[in-house]
């Protein structure tokens, strides 16, 4: 994927860059694999904001992605590579030999016309899904299951990949993109290769309105709010926060406080915490 920049015709285009979308081969999604999903806008079932800075944005059709790859031993042909507004990775449309269709995450190097397979005897090639026990050491993988048969949960964003480091007993050792090293059961499936569209991290938004198209609302600093809205708020003029350390809107310590729950079931599976 190449990145296209704009000339400074307006302040909004001065620093704006976009993807060229040169790898996209089909503009309209497969209708049978889409549905209109209600957007929560950061609210819970009572209408109370639980996630800030969300709301608005363009309407989207949700594409049903096959994270399980449960059509074992059925060859599939890559029919198209499509844009997905719900994620930063591209998606690949598969036509299975039994007549079914499905979407998977597009792996780097996967092209239209390629054949992909899923199962313990699948070849070690980009886009194929195998149990971790059958994947060679040092292989780059993505879409990794945490529970056998549940579907891929780890390493699903653009440009990311994990590495298989070791196999011992019923577990394999993985190095995740965050730097975390952990055990995963060897029966779990993973897909070979790195997810494409890695250059997405180099794109410059350029203007505030483009974030609004994406459904991202402005982030207001706590120090400019009223005391009723934030512990940092209030005061006459430009006042300091009035505390020894910054806190969240709910009064919990911010900036550096670890937020992972203690005594979590997976603590004994993590060899080294993320960096």
Swiss-Prot record:
<dbReference type="InterPro" id="IPR008991">
    <property type="entry name" value="Translation_prot_SH3-like_sf"/>
</dbReference>
<dbReference type="InterPro" id="IPR014722">
    <property type="entry name" value="Rib_uL2_dom2"/>
</dbReference>
<keyword id="KW-0687">Ribonucleoprotein</keyword>
<comment type="similarity">
    <text>Belongs to the universal ribosomal protein uL2 family.</text>
</comment>
<keyword id="KW-0699">rRNA-binding</keyword>
<dbReference type="InterPro" id="IPR022669">
    <property type="entry name" value="Ribosomal_uL2_C"/>
</dbReference>
<dbReference type="InterPro" id="IPR005880">
    <property type="entry name" value="Ribosomal_uL2_bac/org-type"/>
</dbReference>
<dbReference type="Pfam" id="PF03947">
    <property type="entry name" value="Ribosomal_L2_C"/>
</dbReference>
<dbReference type="GO" id="GO:0032543">
    <property type="term" value="P:mitochondrial translation"/>
</dbReference>
<dbReference type="InterPro" id="IPR014726">
    <property type="entry name" value="Ribosomal_uL2_dom3"/>
</dbReference>
<keyword id="KW-0689">Ribosomal protein</keyword>
<dbReference type="GO" id="GO:0003735">
    <property type="term" value="F:structural constituent of ribosome"/>
</dbReference>
<dbReference type="InterPro" id="IPR022671">
    <property type="entry name" value="Ribosomal_uL2_CS"/>
</dbReference>
<dbReference type="GO" id="GO:0005762">
    <property type="term" value="C:mitochondrial large ribosomal subunit"/>
</dbReference>
<protein>
    <recommendedName>
        <fullName>Large ribosomal subunit protein uL2c</fullName>
    </recommendedName>
</protein>
<keyword id="KW-0694">RNA-binding</keyword>
<dbReference type="GO" id="GO:0016740">
    <property type="term" value="F:transferase activity"/>
</dbReference>
<comment type="subunit">
    <text>Part of the 50S ribosomal subunit.</text>
</comment>
<keyword id="KW-0194">Cyanelle</keyword>
<keyword id="KW-0934">Plastid</keyword>
<dbReference type="Pfam" id="PF00181">
    <property type="entry name" value="Ribosomal_L2"/>
</dbReference>
<dbReference type="InterPro" id="IPR012340">
    <property type="entry name" value="NA-bd_OB-fold"/>
</dbReference>
<feature type="region of interest" description="Disordered">
    <location>
        <begin position="225"/>
        <end position="259"/>
    </location>
</feature>
<dbReference type="InterPro" id="IPR022666">
    <property type="entry name" value="Ribosomal_uL2_RNA-bd_dom"/>
</dbReference>
<dbReference type="GO" id="GO:0009842">
    <property type="term" value="C:cyanelle"/>
</dbReference>
<dbReference type="InterPro" id="IPR002171">
    <property type="entry name" value="Ribosomal_uL2"/>
</dbReference>
<dbReference type="GO" id="GO:0019843">
    <property type="term" value="F:rRNA binding"/>
</dbReference>
